[in-house]
Amino acid sequence: EARGFGVSRILFPMINEAIIVLENGIASKEDSDTAMMYGANHKMGPLALAELVGLDICLAIMETTFTETGGFKYRPAPPLQQMVCAGLLGQKAGEGFYKY
């Protein structure tokens, strides 16, 4: 029996990596989202999806999964922590990676 829901354990490392890619200047938020939509046939990109879920919820899930598993891939990227602390939570706050 494994801790955490299967979808969360697959989805949140992808969201986390998209944040790291953005932070490191490898790709823009738009490029990352577009790449996953067209390259992987996802209905929306990882950053747009994170903002739909709520960046605070994403952070809480990553922190819990990281604590429970110790898996480095679940350790929240620092920009996510900073954004949540600043109240930039995504769609419900009107701003996150994107403005709504």
List each model region and its residues:
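NAD(P)-dependent Rossmann-like dehydrogenase/reductase catalytic/cofactor-binding core
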Residues: 1-5, 13, 19-24, 28-100
